[in-house]
A protein has these predicted regions:
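Amphipathic/hydrophobic helical signal segments and adjacent flexible N-terminal regions
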Residues: 2-46, 52, 130-140
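Extended, hydrophobic interaction surfaces within ordered domains
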Residues: 19-20, 111-115
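Central antiparallel beta-sheet cores of small beta-barrel/beta-sandwich binding domains
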Residues: 29-107, 114-115, 125
Length: 140
């Protein structure tokens, strides 16, 4: 029974890893999931997780948008993404491994939506998350 359990757990882990979004799949996946509309927003700037503190927070983020492409960091994760209309689709990477994806929508200075485990390529049943943009006091 013990060996069966070990084999089952090992195969489950291999299956979960093989189903996750891979580094080479990011660009095609982002283009497919985003919808391909021209960007209506620019999310370049400094962002904060609205949860602030607690068990799980993303932390501070710095995003740069060029046309519809997004790069940057949020907390310990490197970010790659696209903007389609007012929708933002992000991939959270660390050491070339995809851990999470997110689908967010811009409402004034708030990005709000859901994040998903990398194994959830269809982005169903996500976890709520949101980020608020920091106002640069020198630009007032």
């Amino acid at each position: 029974m013990r060996s069966f359990l070990t084999v089952f757990l090992t195969l489950s882990l291999i299956f979960a890893i093989s189903c996750a979004l891979k580094q080479k799949e990011i660009d095609p996946w982002l283009n497919t999931i985003s919808g391909g509309k021209p960007p209506e927003i620019d999310i370049t700037g400094k962002w904060y997780d609205t949860q602030g503190s607690g068990f799980f927070t993303w932390g501070e983020g710095y995003l740069r948008q060029e046309q519809n492409k997004i790069t940057g960091t949020i907390g310990d994760y490197n970010i790659k993404g696209v903007v389609s209309g007012k929708i933002v689709c992000l991939v959270f990477l660390s050491r070339n491994t995809v851990y999470y994806t997110a689908r967010l929508e811009m409402f004034q200075d708030l990005l709000s939506g859901n994040y998903f485990k990398a194994t959830n390529k269809e982005q169903k049943r996500g976890y709520p998350t949101s980020f608020t943009k920091t106002v640069d006091p020198t630009k007032k």
